[in-house]
Structure formats: C-alpha cells, structure tokens
Amino acid sequence: MLQANKIIAALEKQEITHVVGVPDNGSRTLYEQLWAHDKIEVVLTSREGEAYGLASGLYLGGANPLVLIQNTGFFEAGDAFRGTAYNMGIPLVSLIGYRGYKTMEPGAPRVDTAATFFEPTLKAWNIPYTAMHGDDDIGQIDQAFKKAAEISLPTAVLIVPETT
C-alpha cells in the first residue's frame, strides 16, 4: 500500500510549492488530497510535456515544483523534458506512475509495453530513479531531492501501486 497522505507529508518536508502534471487512475487519490491541500498548488497541464516546461519555469522563478505524471505521459514528454529540465540542469523531482508493472509478473496474461519500455528509457536518458512499492519506500522521495540537488539534474521516483 502507498498512502497519499504519507507522500504529501514527504512533499511538505521538501517545501514543495507546486505539483505540476496530468492525473491518472494510479495517482487519483494523491491528486484528490493535493487539491485539498492549502499550501501546495496543483497545476494541471493538457500534456505531460507541458509539465516539464512549466515546472522548469516555476523553478527559475523561485518556486519548488514537483512533476506528477504516469509513465505513458513521460514517453510523450521526452523532448520537452530534454529541452527544459535536463538541458537546463534543473534539480527537478518527478513522481511517475508505473502503469503496467504487474503485467510483467510471470504468468500475467499480457505484458503492457508501457512497463517494459519504462525503466530502459529512464536508464537511456541517464535519469537516476528508485521505485516505491509501499509506505516503507516513501523515504526515497527525500533521497531523490538530495540526488537532484547533488547532480543539478532531474531525478524520478516511480509509483508502483495505485495510491490510496
């Protein structure tokens, strides 16, 4: 289980000002709780690529944003990610939903290529990442922020189960 309120507590610890992205079924509960939050502003975009440009601009303007999207949207965002957050050296953390993860288990009836392409893409693009499978992994968010600041580049934390 991955509880949205515990993720939000980690974001508060990092003093996140904005969460930028596109909601999906896996992050629905997290978005719902963020919309009710009084200090973190949620900014929705129509495409995931816009999230990286907008978050990069917010960072340059002095805000402390986070991108929240799904892996399929991350694929769509590739060039915008490269041209903004990565090339500009923005220490931006993304929480990325891992659609299709369970389809890679032995005996699964079908494999979702969104899952099989995901980690190889992160590796090819030199994006440091970890994966949260449950509440015990939420500390990875803090580590992602430390790593992003250390290398002055984006990092990612993958959200494997749906948030509750």
Task: Give the positions of each predicted feature.
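Thiamine diphosphate
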Residues: M1-T164
